[in-house]
Amino acid sequence: MAENQNNLIWIDLEMTGLDPERDRIIEIATLVTDANLNILAEGPVLAVHQSAEQLGLMDEWNVRTHTGSGLVERVKTSPFNDRDAELQTIEFLKQWVPAGVSPICGNSVGQDRRFLFRYMPELEAYFHYRYVDVSTLKELARRWKPEILAGFKKQNTHQALDDIRESVAELAYYREHFIQS
């Protein structure tokens, strides 16, 4: 392991819904790549315990998706609360990237950041204020070069580690097929 200011921190959260005032984080995963998108390390993948009452607030899509993946059961039996998951994630990141230098990287990470700000503020503050949001490139490709979208198929497992691995691969695809140097 080698701390490097050019390494990138990738994150994905699974939540009980989309509203950070009402909904909660139920899974967190991170990984670190070098500047060329080579995966250097995968961080802890943690189900975050939430009460039965909180889980009962999920809409039909979230119940179906997170029950089908086994995440709801993992959340019910998880020993980790928000703070535990936050601290374990930060300890992992400290080995690879200094605080305050990596943008937050992933797909639709603005949404993830809203939840981090609310429930894991120390982790949110670990990131630089900038974003590397793969969904931005997808939206631009859809408008400017839609023919390339068919070349990358997402699995959409809605499991945090699978989703971030896929985000890294998707950015590498856009780098090769959309971004011209």
UniProtKB/Swiss-Prot annotation:
Record's subcellular location: Cytoplasm
UniProt record, GO biological process: DNA metabolic process
Enzyme class: hydrolase
Keywords: Cytoplasm, Exonuclease, Hydrolase, Nuclease
Pfam families named among the record's database cross-references: RNase_T (PF00929)
Superkingdom of the organism of origin: Bacteria
Keyword Secreted (UniProt): no
One GO MF term: nucleic acid binding
EC numbers: 3.1.15.-
Coarse class of the protein's main subcellular location: cytoplasm
Active site: Y129
Residue ranges of domain Exonuclease in the record: 8-171
GO cellular component: cytoplasm
Classification via InterPro entries: Exonuclease_RNaseT/DNA_pol3, Oligoribonuclease, RNaseH-like_sf, RNaseH_sf
CDD domains registered for this protein in UniProt: Orn
Family recorded in the similarity comment: Belongs to the oligoribonuclease family.
Biological role stated in the UniProt entry: 3'-to-5' exoribonuclease specific for small oligoribonucleotides.
UniProt-listed NCBIfam families: PRK05359.1
Protein name (database record): Oligoribonuclease
Lineage, uppermost ranks: Bacteria, Pseudomonadati, Pseudomonadota, Gammaproteobacteria, Enterobacterales
